[in-house]
């Protein structure tokens, strides 16, 4: 098949044909204003897609009241994560073969359509559908943002910009619940979704007018061959496997017993479908969603391992720390967000500093090692919180945890850009993005199971007269309002035990992230690298 040059409909600055200092392919000489404008726009886009994970949490009570849909609560969150995970790798293929700009704008359009559907829907089913559509688009936003930065900024300067994009996850995770609560109380829960529309419009405008992709050789498959290039057989096995896994983790131990046929079948299907997916990837070779030569690269699988463990640990803490503040310290949704600021400030500041360190010294390995060690210490200390722990403890422990996350969160993306040829960077970026998203989705569910089961067990030991279902349905912020004074201490101790047991998941993951750092090669981002795009013909 002939190769054609991917051109951009907008005028481009004249690029230099010489490699930049980092050894990457030539790119347009973007000026400071262009880089700053694009960075702000992309940060807003990542902020919105990250905000959608947490902003709905404080709006759910009002939504279920309006739709009388208590049974649908789990789907409001999982539907977004499911489709997000399911499309991340597929977007890697799109970014490989087609214009980064237009694939990104298409993903953003899908996300915006989903947000609009969520805002205007008159039914609970419509809300779930809107969340699914938004998740489809979200699967291509973060990886697309990283690729736009990669095509605008030289390799040795990218760590800072990559860190800025990654810090949006932390900011959104803390801002989501109080912002959702404020919008729900003062306007309507529908504005939790409408808020994405103007922000998305700004992002789209900036990307449309300021991003001029470098001249690059990309093979654009004919429409009739597009399906084979997108690995439909692999997707046929992979997408249901992810759905089965997340459903099993969400339902197991809560809605259904772990020994129930439904959960067992879901786990068995997950295993069978994943094995079939692996077989298809080996057979498809270069046309696979995950080409074996990329997955077998030790830097890629070790970075993916680091990403899934670090993000899994981080999501456990950002999900359950607000619950600890609301239940144990009687904080409102807004105040719990403020009490979470030590960790988020640490993540944001240290993410930027870590990017500078990699830029200055050229190596990400020491930063990732420090990340694993610091996160493990901070996670371990957070798991020791008691009902009478003072502010010095929960502030200090959060800072340590945030330092660990900030140091390591964006380094896997630098690994991808440093060790893979430019033609493989979209696929490698999608692999890391998928690992991060899947880590959050899986281990939030694992933490939820541990929390609910441990709370029921501990509550039975502390005070068998307390109705566990009633306490959980009452919510963390109303415990003191509805519980008799004599039952409150036992309930608080049970809450504390259950939450810190969930924190053990984060401790284990933080410790396991060390495996990824040990397996990485030491390769400087300042040295020239192989930038020849691979032939994706698969022949």
From Swiss-Prot:
GO CC field: plasma membrane
Family annotation (InterPro entries): MFS (IPR011701), MFS_dom (IPR020846), MFS_trans_sf (IPR036259), Sugar_transporter_CS (IPR005829)
Region (Disordered): 1-25
Gene3D superfamilies named in the record: MFS general substrate transporter like domains (1.20.1250.20), Multidrug resistance protein D (1.20.1720.10)
Keywords: Membrane, Transmembrane, Transmembrane helix
Compartments reported by the entry: Membrane
Membrane topology: Multi-pass membrane protein
Residue spans crossing the bilayer: 36-56, 108-128, 133-153, 160-180, 191-211, 233-253, 262-282, 305-325, 338-360, 362-384, 395-415, 502-522
Family matches, as Pfam families: MFS_1
Induction: Expression is decreased in presence of phenylacetic acid (PAA).
Predominant place of localization: membrane
Domain of life: Eukaryota
Result of knocking out the encoding gene: Does not affect the biosynthesis of roquefortine C and meleagrin.
Any one GO molecular-function label of the UniProt entry: transmembrane transporter activity
Biotech use, per record: The indole alkaloid meleagrin was shown to be a good candidate to control c-Met-dependent breast cancer proliferation, migration and invasion.
Primary role: Efflux pump; part of the gene cluster that mediates the biosynthesis of the mycotoxins roquefortine C and meleagrin.
Family the entry assigns: Belongs to the major facilitator superfamily. TCR/Tet family.
Name this protein carries in UniProt: Efflux pump roqT
Gene: roqT
